[in-house]
Amino acid sequence: MLMKPIIFTLLFTAISISFTAQIGLDITAKGQFNSTWLFNQNISDDGAEQDYAPGWGSHYGLGLGMRLGFFGIGMETNFGKHNAEYSGVIANQDYASTVALSTFQLPLFLRFQNKGGVYFEMGAQYNRIRKALYTRENLFPVSSDVSGDYAKSYSTALIGFGINRKILKSVPLGFVFGVRLQYGIKDARGVDAYGLPLDNTLFYPNYAKTRAASAGINIGLMYTIDTKEKESGY
């Protein structure tokens, strides 16, 4: 539900800008390396039997932005992995498990950038789960497709900051380096560290939502088409 008002706000802003002034266009090719997590209160409450471990994921894609001076709006289309890692001890037996989500991501955001290229961004991201794979090691090793236990899609709120610097003054190509943080708005559902569905009332009488979270480093190249370069200074 949150995505719709954000989309309408971005579209209204874009139309308003286009009627009042010429705009700059930013085309970006980028990748991001993330620390990724899937948080659920029922897992958190299970102590040493189910514990979180650092998970890592990445994505890559293309972005398009519209800019007027310091203010801009943008969107991206990305493909990537969001992985959640777990570890625990059952009957003195250690185990480790992983949930690997293959996702399509559509972030929409507002961006504020000064003349030095430093920027701050905030918005929301639509995440489509293309596939979910669960694996467990040491304790009864298993690998299974758990896509049916996850929501078809979920959304996250995002904030980020970084810098966009031109490589050469004579070339409208910049190097982008930044950090982006995300946290789940909608329930991603899913399985626990054992691979059991989190909506199974036999194991979890009190249902708890699953929140996807990530923190990562953005690296990319941005090509700028600036219709008022001399006037704006960007």
Give, region by region, the residue ranges found by the protein language model:
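Extracellular/periplasm-exposed beta-strand and loop segments of Gram-negative cell-envelope proteins
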Residues: 36-55, 78-101, 128-155, 186-197, ...
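Sec-dependent N-terminal signal peptides
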Residues: 5-15
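Predominantly the C-terminal beta-signal and adjacent terminal strand-loop region
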Residues: 152-234
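Sec/Tat signal peptide C-region and signal peptidase I cleavage site
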Residues: 15-21
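Positively charged n-region of N-terminal signal peptides that target proteins for export
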Residues: 1-6, 22
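Outer-membrane beta-barrel pore domains and translocons
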Residues: 30-36, 78-80, 125-127, 178-184, ...
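Short glycine/proline- and aromatic-enriched beta-strand/turn motifs that initiate or cap beta-hairpins
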Residues: 21-76, 222-229, 234
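Gram-negative (and chloroplast) outer-membrane scaffold detector with strong preference
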Residues: 63-140, 149-175
